[in-house]
């Protein structure tokens, strides 16, 4: 409680000292009013006041003590206008006769006692078992309610609360709100709490504004001021200086960082006019890039009554253009390009990749960097060279357009006649390919090996319009095909691999789909031909009488021969034919993976064992004839080996090659296991005789285009070689 009373104002300057009360310390207590201590109220007479003043002057050497300043500061006792007590040291509400401070403090203590008693009663009630059960039932009922029902129930219960309960609820709700950092930050009241201070300090360190500071209620300190919005709130040096006035380094650092981000920004949204108004809610101007006009910045003051709203500022004439067109590089860095091509409306290229003839104007916004201009010029030059303004896949692709006309053989006239893609005038072809192959002037054989044909590629024989743009091959690329032994003793010959790698370096920029498909087929056929030649070379090393494949020259890459490589057709396992005579070991090399091919050395093929013969589907699968499995589901292998050509045809084997393969296999099985057919004079009578072999070979050659092509190319050599094989 207060120990000083309410003082009256002096009546006149002459009796100023009379109307002041002194401290009762060291003197007898003076009580004028039983309800107020040291009060000069109605019960005090003028005579008593005079005695009090005289007693104070005699006891303290004419110095009066003021209770407002602690009773220790001496004041001059002489009367005069200059010796009056200043009004700032006098307590307010001088004309009241009561003591509001003491009464308020008394009520406060009484309320505290009431609150303590209430809390004790609440604690005692919480320990009551009956009350606990009832409260748990109420809580269970409250949990099943919806949010609206809970709010309505709480509101109805609060209507019946007393003033003490209301104050208690207010205090509890405030404590609950302060425990939540979001509520503490957004709440307009109690914005000076510890959590709010920490959040505001964090925002100030980041250079952002505090929403709680903008929502703070009006107080005597800031009633006449208005929180002004900074036009560049994000990373603004002004905001940093406002939160830390003494730290100028942070402001300069933020200013430099903001300038750097603005210079390198490519896709951030800009600001429109009227976006930086002062909002009472969330601050939408915290990511603004452009400030207002200079006139608007000068007119902004701390007073809210004299500030001009930004919406009335028409000094910026940027309404009709992009909000971020403020520099010479904005068009290059802008996500929206000035061209009409949708492909250039991306962030990756800094220059348009496609030619735009309609684009004109070289204003300040179209100024390019030197490097960008150089890149654009190089792209345009490449498009003109490539043709029709198409985008090059790789601008660093080397172009080889040199011609090599040296060391061209004079005997190989077949390589220089006709529309041959690999003729001696084509750029980039090794000169060694023109060496005479030993086959005379026949141009079909060489053309079948390397000619792709104008019908497939749509080109002509002009060397300058070569469709493939083949880079120069190594001089040793085809040398392996010209050695006496063929150079293919090792299947993984490095020279052959070099040749295939050189053929893989073709320029495919100007090829359409059909040309690319034909090129892939040609490369596949060449690979098959090379593998076949490698197998034939291995067989020739075992046969002294084998034909030297070195005479083939470059014609070894013929697609006609490639048709025999790796084929597992039934025809490859028939009796000696024109093809087998023409190419010794070809049947053995082609049928190495099958069961029907015969060895060129005269050896028999491997006959399946009894376990395989018992499983007819597996046996047919081994013979590559599994398509006829349903035809022999009910047949035994012993019945099958006794069948003839007519019986197989009745079983549904309509293909002549399949029947011949079956008959040959059946004959081998009968020979191995000693089974004889009725009327069989000699082993193998189930197979057609020599005349039938010749007729069948002629039919087979008529069915196969590849065999006919080989017959024409060999030119009778195959017929001459077939006679000793037939005698065998």
UniProtKB/Swiss-Prot annotation:
Task: Identify the residues that the record assigns to the SAM domain, covering every copy.
Answer: 611-672
The GO terms this record gives for MF are: mRNA binding; nucleotide binding
Q: Which domain of life is it from?
A: Eukaryota
What InterPro entries does this protein's entry cite? SAM, SAM/pointed_sf, SMAUG/VTS1_RNA-bind, VTS1_SAM
Q: Which GO terms describe its biological process?
A: nuclear-transcribed mRNA poly(A) tail shortening; protein transport
Bias-annotated ranges (Polar residues): 11-25, 277-286, 334-344, 456-469
Function according to Swiss-Prot or TrEMBL = RNA-binding protein involved in post-transcriptional regulation through transcript degradation.
- A Pfam family reported for this protein in Swiss-Prot or TrEMBL: SAM_2
Gene giving rise to this polypeptide = VTS1
Question: Which cellular compartments is it found in?
Answer: Cytoplasm, Cytosol; Cytoplasm, P-body
**Name of the protein this chain belongs to:** RNA-binding protein VTS1
Q: Disulfide bonds, which pairs?
A: none
Subunit and partners: Monomer. Binds to RNA.
Give the Acidic residues compositional bias ranges. 698-708
Where does it sit, as one GO cellular component term?
Answer: P-body
In this chain, composition skew of type Gly residues spans 586-596
> What does the sequence similarity comment in the record state about its family?
Belongs to the VTS1 family.
Where is composition skewed (Low complexity) in this entry? 210-220, 536-550, 717-728
The species is Mycosarcoma maydis (Corn smut fungus)
The major lineage groups are:
Eukaryota, Fungi, Dikarya, Basidiomycota, Ustilaginomycotina
Keyword terms, alphabetized: Cytoplasm, Nucleotide-binding, Protein transport, RNA-binding, Transport
Main location, first listed in the record: cytoplasm
Q: Where is this region: Disordered?
A: 1-41, 57-101, 210-230, 261-344, 456-482, 536-608, 677-728
């Amino acid at each position: 409680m207060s120990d000083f009373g309410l003082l009256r104002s002096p009546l006149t300057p002459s009796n100023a000292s009379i109307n002041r009360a002194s401290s009762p310390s060291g003197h007898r207590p003076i009580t004028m009013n039983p309800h107020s201590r040291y009060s000069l109220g109605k019960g005090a007479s003028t005579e008593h006041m005079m005695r009090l003043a005289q007693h104070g002057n005699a006891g303290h050497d004419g110095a009066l003590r003021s209770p407002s300043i602690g009773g220790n500061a001496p004041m001059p006792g002489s009367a005069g206008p200059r010796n009056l007590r200043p009004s700032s040291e006098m307590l307010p509400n001088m004309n009241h006769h009561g003591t509001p401070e003491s009464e308020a403090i008394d009520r406060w203590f009484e309320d505290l006692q009431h609150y303590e008693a209430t809390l004790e009663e609440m604690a005692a009630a919480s320990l009551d078992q009956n009350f606990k059960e009832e409260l748990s039932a109420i809580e269970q009922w409250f949990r099943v309610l919806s949010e609206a029902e809970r709010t309505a129930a709480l509101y109805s219960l609060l209507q019946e609360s007393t003033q003490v309960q209301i104050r208690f609820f207010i205090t509890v709700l405030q404590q609950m709100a302060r425990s939540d950092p979001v509520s503490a930050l957004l709440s307009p009241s109690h914005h000076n709490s510890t959590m709010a201070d920490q959040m505001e300090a964090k925002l100030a360190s980041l250079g952002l504004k505090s929403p709680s500071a903008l929502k703070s209620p009006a107080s005597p300190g800031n009633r006449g001021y208005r929180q002004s919005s900074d036009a560049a709130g994000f990373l603004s040096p002004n905001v940093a200086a406002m939160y830390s006035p003494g730290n100028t380094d942070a402001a300069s650092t933020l200013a430099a960082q903001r300038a750097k981000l603005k210079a390198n920004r490519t896709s951030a949204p800009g600001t429109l006019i009227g976006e930086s108004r002062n909002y009472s809610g969330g601050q939408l101007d915290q990511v603004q890039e452009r400030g207002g006009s200079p006139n608007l910045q000068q007119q902004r003051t701390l007073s809210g009554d004299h500030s001009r709203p930004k919406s009335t500022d028409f000094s910026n004439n940027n309404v009709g253009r992009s909000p971020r067109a403020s520099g010479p590089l904005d068009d290059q860095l802008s996500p929206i390009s000035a061209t009409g091509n949708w492909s250039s409306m991306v962030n990756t290229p800094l220059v348009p990749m496609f030619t735009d003839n309609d684009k004109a104007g070289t204003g300040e916004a179209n100024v390019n960097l030197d490097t960008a201009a150089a890149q654009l010029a190089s792209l345009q030059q490449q498009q003109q060279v490539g043709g029709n303004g198409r985008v090059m896949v790789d601008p660093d692709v080397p172009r080889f357009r040199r011609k090599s006309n040296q060391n061209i053989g004079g005997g190989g006239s077949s390589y220089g006649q006709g529309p041959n893609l690999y003729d001696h005038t084509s750029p980039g072809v090794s000169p060694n390919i023109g060496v005479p192959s030993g086959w005379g002037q026949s141009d079909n054989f060489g053309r079948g090996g390397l000619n792709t044909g104008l019908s497939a590629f749509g080109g002509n024989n002009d060397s300058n319009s070569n469709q493939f743009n083949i880079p120069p091959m190594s001089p040793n690329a085809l040398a392996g095909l010209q050695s006496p032994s063929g150079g293919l003793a090792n299947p993984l010959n490095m020279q052959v691999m070099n040749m295939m790698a050189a053929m893989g370096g073709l320029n495919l920029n100007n090829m359409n789909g059909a040309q690319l498909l034909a090129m892939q087929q040609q490369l596949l056929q060449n690979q098959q031909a090379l593998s076949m030649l490698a197998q034939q070379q291995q067989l020739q090393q075992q046969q002294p009488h084998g034909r030297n494949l070195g005479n083939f020259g470059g014609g070894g890459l013929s697609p006609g021969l490639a048709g025999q490589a790796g084929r597992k057709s039934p025809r490859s396992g028939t009796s000696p034919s024109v093809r087998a005579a023409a190419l010794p070991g070809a049947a053995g090399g082609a049928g190495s993976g099958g069961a029907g091919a015969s060895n060129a050395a005269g050896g028999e093929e491997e006959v399946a064992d009894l376990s395989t013969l018992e499983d007819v589907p597996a046996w047919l699968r081994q013979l590559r004839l599994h398509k006829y499995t349903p035809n022999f589901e009910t047949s035994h292998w012993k019945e099958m080996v006794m069948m003839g050509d007519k019986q197989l045809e009745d079983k549904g084997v309509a293909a002549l090659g399949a029947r011949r393969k079956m008959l040959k296999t059946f004959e081998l099985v009968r020979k191995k296991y000693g089974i004889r057919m009725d009327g069989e004079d000699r082993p193998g009578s189930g197979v057609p005789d020599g005349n039938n072999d010749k007729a069948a070979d002629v039919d087979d050659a008529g069915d196969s285009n590849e065999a006919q092509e080989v017959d024409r190319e060999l030119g009778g050599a195959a017929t001459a070689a077939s006679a000793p094989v037939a005698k065998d």
